[in-house]
């Protein structure tokens, strides 16, 4: 499905009350990038705009660390806007990003393979967030 990018911030962040945030608004704050490994290619980055230079960047490979940095450093990350509340209650919010980009969220499956139960469960959960965008 397609999703507009959002900025994840802690609820008391100076930008949290804005209806829309621009990349320019984010410049004074540390950007958090999630990396899968030391040699990850920019082509497989999980965050939009990760190739845009910033003054402060923290690269993490632990999703819990992302939350802790958001809470402790007024840091941010850019993603789909989907953030399960069970990960940190009401402390993390998402604000739409004022950029003309679209994220495409889905999965890749070998043509000779069927989804297992975990994969089917994943798709069911995704569809709850985007029922109009199959």
Predicted regions and their residues:
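Flexible hinge/capping segments at coil-to-helix
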Residues: 1-31, 35
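Short secondary-structure boundary segments
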Residues: 11, 38, 80-83
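Structural motif corresponding to alpha-helix initiation and N-cap regions
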Residues: 20, 60-63
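Secondary-structure junction motif
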Residues: 23, 29-52, 115-119, 133
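Short helix-loop capping/hinge motifs at secondary-structure junctions, enriched
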Residues: 12-21, 99-101, 112-118
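Beta-alpha-beta core module
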Residues: 3-4, 64-114
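A local structural motif
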Residues: 48-57, 91-92
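Extended ligand-binding regions for polar small-molecule ligands
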Residues: 24, 104, 108-134
């Amino acid at each position: 499905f397609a999703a507009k990018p959002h900025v994840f911030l802690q609820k008391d962040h100076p930008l949290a009350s804005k209806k829309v945030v621009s990349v320019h608004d984010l410049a004074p704050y540390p950007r958090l990038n999630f990396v899968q490994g030391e040699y990850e290619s920019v082509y497989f980055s999980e965050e939009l705009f990760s190739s845009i230079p910033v003054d402060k960047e923290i690269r993490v490979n632990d999703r819990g660390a992302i939350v802790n940095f958001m809470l402790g450093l007024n840091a941010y990350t850019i993603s789909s806007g989907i953030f399960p509340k069970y990960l940190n209650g009401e402390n993390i919010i998402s604000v739409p990003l004022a950029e003309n980009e679209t994220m495409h969220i889905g999965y890749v499956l070998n043509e000779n393979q069927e989804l297992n139960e975990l994969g089917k469960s994943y798709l069911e959960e995704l569809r709850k967030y985007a029922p109009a965008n199959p």
